[in-house]
């Protein structure tokens, strides 16, 4: 009887140790907030969500920020370097659309460079220096009367922990933001930086 009680106690003790070993108090369960609703109720909130999409490397958040007819535009000095032939006429274009931008950004977030030179970074930091609201502009183009144009200095840092290295870029991005319903979207992202 004593042996049976000892065996039962020993089995219960081992079972409780086994169950306890599955929980690590120094590594609590991660909470995924990426499914939180993205409201973009103001231009500032939209740009904060853009920083969040980069920080979390979340392509779904990123896509929710772009207008369906979104365009990424390059300055003319960059066209020969990074422009792509969007309309298949054999000439590099100074812009690309929603689908191409989502593909490029998904590669950045999750797969690395398309040429295989760079893996996906371990951390991405996009810091936008949003000017005060009184420095925002309205778009003078006909039909864009309710659009807001915000020129932001930015810093983008890609960090690679395994090689203890990082790539950094900075410059000016001009965002053309368009309201639709009670939300704001990026209609045009014009990169005004020199590479």
Regions found by a protein language model. Give the residues of each.
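Surface-exposed, charged secondary-structure patches
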Residues: 86-164
């Amino acid at each position: 009887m004593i042996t049976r009680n000892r065996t039962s106690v020993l089995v219960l003790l081992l079972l409780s140790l086994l169950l306890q070993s599955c929980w690590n108090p120094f590594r609590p369960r991660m909470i995924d907030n990426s499914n939180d609703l993205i409201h973009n109720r103001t231009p500032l909130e939209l740009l904060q969500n853009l920083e969040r999409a980069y920080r979390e490397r979340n392509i779904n958040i990123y896509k929710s920020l772009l207008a369906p007819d979104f365009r990424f535009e390059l300055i003319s000095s960059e066209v020969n370097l990074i422009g792509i032939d969007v309309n298949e006429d054999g000439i590099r274009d100074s812009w690309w659309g929603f689908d191409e931008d989502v593909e490029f950004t998904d590669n950045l977030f999750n797969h690395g460079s398309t040429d295989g030179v760079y893996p996906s970074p371990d951390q991405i930091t996009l810091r936008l220096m949003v000017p005060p609201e009184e420095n925002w502009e309205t778009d003078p183009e006909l039909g864009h009367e309710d659009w807001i144009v915000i020129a932001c200095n930015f810093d983008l840092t890609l960090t690679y922990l395994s090689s203890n290295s990082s790539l950094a870029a900075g410059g000016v991005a001009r965002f053309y933001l368009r309201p639709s319903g009670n939300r704001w979207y990026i209609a045009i992202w014009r990169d005004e930086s020199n590479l």
